[in-house]
Amino acid sequence: MAREFSLENTRNIGIMAHIDAGKTTTTERILFYTGRIHKIGETHEGASQMDWMEQEQERGITITSAATTAQWKNNRINIIDTPGHVDFTVEVERSLRVLDGAVAVLDAQSGVEPQTETVWRQATTYGVPRVVFVNKMDKTGADFLYSVSTLHDRLQANAHPIQLPIGAEDNFEGIIDLVDMVAYFYEDDLGTRTEAKEIPDEYKEQAQEYHEKLVEAAAELDEELMMKYLEGEELTKDELKAAIRKGTCNVEFYPVLCGSAFKNKGVQLMLDAVLDYLPSPLDVPAIKGHVPDTEEEAVRKPGDDQPFAALAFKVMTDPYVGKLTFFRVYSGTLDSGSYVKNSTKDKRERVGRILQMHANHREEISTVYSGDIAAAVGLKDTSTGDTLCDEKNLVILESMEFPEPVIHLSVEPKSKADQDKMGLALAKLAEEDPTFKTHTDEETGQTIIAGMGELHLDIIVDRLRREFKVEANVGAPQVSYRETIRQAAQVEGKFVRQSGGRGQYGHVWIEFSPNEEGAGFEFVNGIVGGVVPREYIPSVQAGLEEALENGLLAGYPVIDIKAKLFDGSYHDVDSSEMAFKIAASMALKNAKSKCNPVLLEPMMKVEVVVPEEYMGDVMGDITSRRGRVEGMEARGNAQVVKAFVPLAEMFGYATSLRSRTQGRGTYTMFFDHYEEVPKSISEEIIKKNSGE
């Protein structure tokens, strides 16, 4: 099968937004207009094309990023629908990694919301160009220019309208295009018929003002145009478009559009903007990686004649075809039935079938080309973030880093039959989601699952029940505490057993000191003159790493600690790797009395949006939860309280906030950093953990 769309006619985009800004509805409309679905599915009726897991349809939120392909004006647009809820930010990061551009959807009433900020920051980190779609222009309180101002105030983004709405709320009738200077009115309910007309008289002045602002902003992106502009010459439409495109692709400029996906207005113009202003795979820098086993840099340029290289960005279990691995091809082509190398794991994989996904049906294809997104069936060892490449030209593309889980709870199967199924099901879920971890507590024998927040784990337990038919009892959520030290000290660890026969002898002196926050464990070998032979030094490090997992105070992992091995002794016959491993762990135990160990707890960054009248009550509640209020700001007719609160105090907060604000308050929270636990509380935790 020959290539259908050239590289410059391909767009890989994501739709990103705050929860409920209308992201899935927007994606739906894109699929409708590009002829991929015949009937529009409404999210609030629970039947949308993109939200295909049962829970997504029930909760009306998007959890997994389904990847779909659509066609518009002889271009292919691959769309990844990303979740807007903070517990799923990893899904967002994962999809941003393989995109070339994104559409940020805002709610016209609220503008930039807390989760928009998080996702925007992630997109900036990965250098993803964006156009902004101000959605829900038909909603009461919709205000386009206010939404644009929030882009400047809250994100410091160089964003400029390239459209203006005609009317708002119930009177939202059409859209003015500030590049072509024409107006579009919508003739029928489905918005498929639009006609370009002259701008109505009452809007001409405003349109001219914003057209000039746009021209000035675009001229600043290009020196030649700036000269022309300063000399008072008119810029042509093509020059204006080219400048906006250049600025957008360089992540220096963000065009802002408006519309109402629900009312079918503005979506086709947004698709035009995706083609006009967002980059094709040829416009973004070639992806860099390195050759396995060496740190030599390798670059993979987009092109079908290049060696094959792709990144797996999502693994899911499908009830019909089994394990599906979604991947983005950066260079070269791949045929179904061929072999590739998973260079991350150094395994050979056979690609069984290749599917191009369309939200809920799939099309089998024989070849996938450079720049495309597809899903493979039959990969056994590949997980999220792995590189797939040509067996003769090996490369490892930069992979993704995922945060550690901050909350965990125990799950117990209700029956013996459930027990066997549960193990398999949890392993599958952990394979799909790198921020979900599962392990067995050796002391209690319980299965512990860990994730990024309460909603995250709720949904996992829900999936166990629905997809895998596993009934389980769920324990109360527990916080993942950490430990660290506050003082440096030199400590000895000596393990000697010499009572006839082969003995054991290991002896080390280690200096433990606090490391910078977030730096983790650092081991320094400071041995001179071979007082501890070279072959035993890895064992000292391994012994420390193991012992750090078991903690000093309450059995929680020790972080941000530096250990310098500077002295010790050995015995020609009795020393062994094992003996030095034990000696190192004994040194860490002895550090407890000298290094002032402390307990750390995860601090969450919390933003609560509440009507003014509940403000005092909500702030009092935050303080009673050991929270620190960092600031407040008015947002529309509501107040936003920003605070840091320990995760341990945030369980059940959703219910408490609902009852305090009669359901009108909303909040978002995500993990920010670790902080020392107050002494009285840490003593209780230590007591509880040592079983007193």
From Swiss-Prot:
It is found in: Cytoplasm. Keywords: Cytoplasm, Elongation factor, GTP-binding, Nucleotide-binding, Protein biosynthesis. This is Elongation factor G. One of its GO terms (molecular function) is translation elongation factor activity. Residues 8-282 form the tr-type G domain. One of its GO terms (biological process) is ribosome disassembly. GO terms for cellular component: cytoplasm. It comes from the Bacteria. Disulfide bonds: none annotated. Belongs to the TRAFAC class translation factor GTPase superfamily. Classic translation factor GTPase family. EF-G/EF-2 subfamily.
